Amino acid sequence: MADLAAGVAERGPRLSLWSSLDQRLVWVVAATALLGLVMVASASISMAEQATGDPFYFFKRQIFFALLGLGMALALLQIPLATWERAGPGLLLGALALLVLVLIPGVGREVNGAVRWIPLGVFNLQVAEVVKVLLALYLAGFLVRRQQQLRTSMAAFLVPVLVSAACAFLLLLQPDFGTALMLMALAVGLLYLAGAPLWRFAALVGVLAAAAAALVVYSPYRWQRVTAFMDPWSDPFNTGFQLTQSLIAIGRGDWLGVGLGGSVQKLFYLPEAHTDFVFSVLAEELGWLGVLAVVLLFSYIVWRAMAVGWQCHRHRLPFAGYLAWAVGLALGLQAFINMGVATGLLPTKGLTLPLFSYGGSSALATGAMVGLLLRCGYELAQARAEGRRPEEAAS
């Protein structure tokens, strides 16, 4: 008993889960989500009234989705990260199974020529959103298991690349080029942060860039999007319609915006105003100051994720470190791509803006990533409470 008591004392006190949460991160995420709800209500009001007779139909559903996302975050917050680390290979198989399942006729639902959703009654599950989370968990576990070989073995370097490429290939069959590109970028980013040799990293980036270019050039649909991106005003009522309407919305907003609810572009001019282009409506109604606020909110979330990841590695919590980095990269990449598309910096991709865009799948996936990030922060705080010193100090 004395030895047991001594061991407990040596490990330090067990922290309360709720009292040790990253309070600033929680408040920033909550503020971002609340602003997102307001913008969904504003951007969808006309479409909802025309489609259902209830101007707040999409807003009410988004509140439900936000609560689902909150529930997902709270549930994952309770689960030790070691559970996910052990389950990595199974999670990967689950991701691949979902990607195959959605392609089976009669299972996946086709919308606008793409088969990306599995009907679940309450909402349609977009498989890519789930795969994004499962792949992040698998990659984090793999990098922990092969951390040393990653710097010396080409096989260890190629496994995460090939796994991500397999997921990307199945996504291209849906087709979902934007998410496929994002998953490959996530894998590349994690390999770089894990310390992969620079020449391998550079070679991989070159190969992926060439592959992406080939997919664009040899696909008339994607090439049309690129040409529309390069000069949207040459065909503003056809191929360049989405981008020109988005740019008009952003231009109308100027510095202070036209006021909440005052957007004209959401009145059936701007397609997907409450989903893919909710950022454009925000820019029109809240102006560049609103845009700056959103950019700062996302910048803080990403910065915090990367900082937590770095501290986890210093305190010898490698799985938590890689997972926090994966969450930061995933949220940051998706937000950057969505904003880049809306402002004309990138070709149209069809990716949602986390915490803003309407949709149950996006809310669940974002909630899962936030819950996992908060769990990483909790286990870091627990390691500090147990007296575990950073590597520099320990040496």
Swiss-Prot record:
Enzyme Commission code(s) on record: 2.4.99.28
Compartments (UniProt record): Cell inner membrane
Pfam families to which the protein is assigned, alphabetical: FTSW_RODA_SPOVE (PF01098)
Any one GO cellular component localisation term in the record: plasma membrane
Main location: membrane
Membrane topology: Multi-pass membrane protein
Periplasmic side: 46-62, 108-116, 174-178, 222-276, 338-352
Keyword check for Cell wall biogenesis/degradation: yes
Protein's pathway: Cell wall biogenesis; peptidoglycan biosynthesis
Residue numbers on the Cytoplasmic membrane side: 1-24, 84-86, 138-152, 200, 298-316, 374-395
NCBIfam families recorded: ftsW
PANTHER family: CELL CYCLE PROTEIN, PEPTIDOGLYCAN GLYCOSYLTRANSFERASE FTSW-RELATED
Function field: Peptidoglycan polymerase that is essential for cell division.
Name by which UniProt lists this protein: Probable peptidoglycan glycosyltransferase FtsW
The encoding gene: ftsW
